[in-house]
């Protein structure tokens, strides 16, 4: 009888020990688990063909072929300070997006590359645009997109586009809003609108925005154009 009781206790203790080990192992596996991609992220990142988009940029020491994704510089302290000082990271994603747009509109003055730099096309990095406080359409769009991501809006919701609009070639930011998980235009210089994000037309419904040559977010670039050669000689929107 004593032996049976002792044996039962040993089995119980062993069971408790194994249960504890399983619990610990399960927790460790959860901690190591790779986060699953948001299905909306997967959808929008696969809706259009991915392409390598290279911008030919002229520097003092020569010409460089730059992957357009390098225009995202979300660790720049100037951008981080703007977001923090102006509380651009407060509110819903839609509210943050609009606050970022309004900040760019209020603080960056539009000027053509030809007037500012003497050449028809020169894409500035965000820190350059912030220093000069002025820039062409793509310059403000690049600042806007960076601010939005630093404001903790998921990267896949933020996209910079280059293409045709009514009047010529243009670069602008689009945003996948929370309202219906569809993209809308956030344009800081061409038909700027201060209306709430939820009240905007879908990008696809905007009558004055035509075909896109290419677009990109922080991780991927999309479109048929593999270099910027297709932009040469295009008529830029004033």
Language model: regions and residue ranges:
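A structural boundary/capping signal
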Residues: 1-238
